[in-house]
Structures are given as structure tokens and as C-alpha cells.
Amino acid sequence: MTIALGKVTKDENDLFDIMDDWLRRDRFVFVGWSGLLLFPCAYFAVGGWFTGTTFVTSWYTHGLASSYLEGCNFLTAAVSTPANSLAHSLLLLWGPEAQGDFTRWCQLGGLWTFVALHGAFGLIGFMLRQFELARSVQLRPYNAIAFSGPIAVFVSVFLIYPLGQSGWFFAPSFGVAAIFRFILFFQGFHNWTLNPFHMMGVAGVLGAALLCAIHGATVENTLFEDGDGANTFRAFNPTQAEETYSMVTANRFWSQIFGVAFSNKRWLHFFMLFVPVTGLWMSALGVVGLALNLRAYDFVSQEIRAAEDPEFETFYTKNILLNEGIRAWMAAQDQPHENLIFPEEVLPRGNAL
């Protein structure tokens, strides 16, 4: 017995096909399936930040003024973290803390969790957008893979670190001066600058900046002369499609400068991708370690000798004293709910004092 299987016909009005056709249609601003996550989350994250920095005080959570309404400027305004007593609560507007009261929700720090979570999902949506567009135009997904670096840093600093501590209170607040305070906090309480993961992150970011500058300058230096103008901007048409720089000339130049040079564009550009992304991932891993209060380098022998010998001091021991000073001065101001009091005689003094 023979059974003939015909082509299965789909309903012309299938909802998925209708949505897929509309979402992925060629338009000035691509939407895509990733846009269903990206655009709402980005809108709420940015809107929440503008709302918080404009109107919302941090008096109830940090004892601070943090909005334009209270006299702050762009550098000092912030959306502050919730109070330490709220631990890791999601602080939902309809949750047991705010009970649907929007004013109370803002006073408790609900905007911080709102901005942090919507911001994280917005960044993930942007990475998915790059995946989706790369697949549509048949590109490899390295743009999306590269963007995983900033996502890793954001998630580790704003979400994983406070999850390892006692609450969202110890995460960075969303503001310029607030981020600076958090950097000082990281140094004082974790000796972050001596952490090898931080060192790898700095090497990655600054190394990428150096590579960018060298690459841009080299391409400009080896452009073919295809015009009569006196300089780059007059001599070359910025809209031309063909490649007009010489990899061979660039290779010869850097071979003479360093003795070695990139032999092909694939390896060169992969290296420019690898350096910053690896640096960002390493720094993110380091922050995850700090969430667990892992220590990095402790040169105890130098600390013991400095304590015993007033004439012995190294840059390391001076930095350790500086960290103790940061902790002593910052903890009392930063955690007023703990009622910490440090008498003058216990504040750290270097051997030179």
C-alpha cells in the first residue's frame, strides 16, 4: 500500500508569520524579535534613570540629596541603591515593601532595582539584536560576541557583586559621582587595584585603545593617492566602495619598527577583538570573586616588617594604610545605619607621620 504525502500548507494568516514579517521588515530602524526585549527594557531603564535623577531623593536610603530637584547637577545626581535593611528584595511596586504606593516605592530605592534589571535585559536584547541582524545579512556573530564583554561587566558589578554582599545597598548607584565613590569603596575594602583580574582588565581596555590608535593611523598613512588634494580629507572620497590602503606597505613599516607585524587582516582584526573583550571578561570574573570576598595579593611579610620597623615602608604598605583610612573614613559616612564611630587615635597613620 502506498501513501502519498503532500506538502503541508500553513494557514496564510498564521500569527507567527504575520509577526515575523512585520518585525523583520526592512525599515529605517530595524525592530526584529530582539526588539521586543530591547526597546521596552531600554525605554524603561533610561526613563527610570531620568525620573530618579530629576525628582527622587536618597534621604531615606543613604541620607543624601541625589536629584536635580534638591540642587544636584549632572555629575552629582544619581539613582541610589535601596537601603541595606531591604537586603536583596526585588522591590516590586506591588510588593510587600511599597504595597502599590509609587511615592513610597521611590523613597525605598525601588527605581534602582527597576533601572538595574531593565538595563541588564536591555543590554542582552541589544546583543540578541546583533545576532539577529548578523543572521539576516549572513554575517558571522562576532559583534554580538564582543558585546558580551560590556554585558559581563554590567551584570557582575551591578547584580552579582551586591548579591554576594548583604544587599543591593553595596552596589553602585547610577550616577557619575556615585560611581567614583564606588571605585573608592572597591579600593578601600577589596584592594581592587592590586587584583590581577583588574590588571588584566586595564591591560585589555588600554591595550585596545592603543591598538585602535595604531590601526587608524596606519590605515590613514597607507592610503593610495587618488586625488590632488593636499590632505586626507580633500584627496579622498569618503563614500568610495573600494579598498584604498596598502596592507603590504603597513606590514613593511611595522616590520621595520618592531621587527614583527601582522601578516594578514584576519589575524590583525581578531587581535583587536580579542584584547578588549578578554580584558572585560577578566575584570568581570574578578568582580565575581570580590562578591565572594576573595582576596588577591596580600604581601604579609612586608606588612609585618613595616609594623616592626618604623624605617621600613614600601608602596604596598603605604597603600594598605591608605585602604585602612578609606575604610575608617568611608564606613561611618557610607553606612550611617551602623552607627560606626572611629576615635581619632585608631585612624591609621603611616610611619612617616
From Swiss-Prot:
Intracellular or extracellular location(s): Plastid, Chloroplast thylakoid membrane
Swiss-Prot/TrEMBL keywords: Acetylation, Chlorophyll, Chloroplast, Chromophore, Electron transport, Iron, Magnesium, Membrane, Metal-binding, Oxidoreductase, Phosphoprotein, Photosynthesis, Photosystem II, Plastid, Thylakoid, Transmembrane, Transmembrane helix, Transport
Membrane topology: Multi-pass membrane protein
Textual note on the cofactor: The D1/D2 heterodimer binds P680, chlorophylls that are the primary electron donor of PSII, and subsequent electron acceptors. It shares a non-heme iron and each subunit binds pheophytin, quinone, additional chlorophylls, carotenoids and lipids. There is also a Cl(-1) ion associated with D1 and D2, which is required for oxygen evolution. The PSII complex binds additional chlorophylls, carotenoids and specific lipids.
EC number of the protein: 1.10.3.9
Pfam annotation, one family: Photo_RC
Record GO biological process: photosynthetic electron transport in photosystem II
Reaction(s) catalysed (UniProt annotation): 2 a plastoquinone + 4 hnu + 2 H2O = 2 a plastoquinol + O2
Phosphothreonine: modified positions: 2
Residues annotated as transmembrane: 41-61, 125-141, 153-166, 208-228, 279-295
GO cellular component, one term: chloroplast thylakoid membrane
Binding site for chlorophyll a PD2: 198
Binding site for chlorophyll a ChlzD2: 118
List of residues that carry N-acetylthreonine: 2
List of residues binding Fe cation: 215, 269
Matching InterPro entries: D1/D2, Photo_II_D1/D2_sf, Photo_RC_L/M, Photo_RC_L/M_CS, PSII_PsbD/D2
Role summary: Photosystem II (PSII) is a light-driven water:plastoquinone oxidoreductase that uses light energy to abstract electrons from H(2)O, generating O(2) and a proton gradient subsequently used for ATP formation. It consists of a core antenna complex that captures photons, and an electron transfer chain that converts photonic excitation into a charge separation. The D1/D2 (PsbA/PsbD) reaction center heterodimer binds P680, the primary electron donor of PSII as well as several subsequent electron acceptors. D2 is needed for assembly of a stable PSII complex.
Subunit structure: PSII is composed of 1 copy each of membrane proteins PsbA, PsbB, PsbC, PsbD, PsbE, PsbF, PsbH, PsbI, PsbJ, PsbK, PsbL, PsbM, PsbT, PsbX, PsbY, PsbZ, Psb30/Ycf12, at least 3 peripheral proteins of the oxygen-evolving complex and a large number of cofactors. It forms dimeric complexes.
Family to which the UniProt record says this protein belongs: Belongs to the reaction center PufL/M/PsbA/D family.
NCBIfam families on file: psbD
Protein name per the record: Photosystem II D2 protein
Annotated gene: psbD
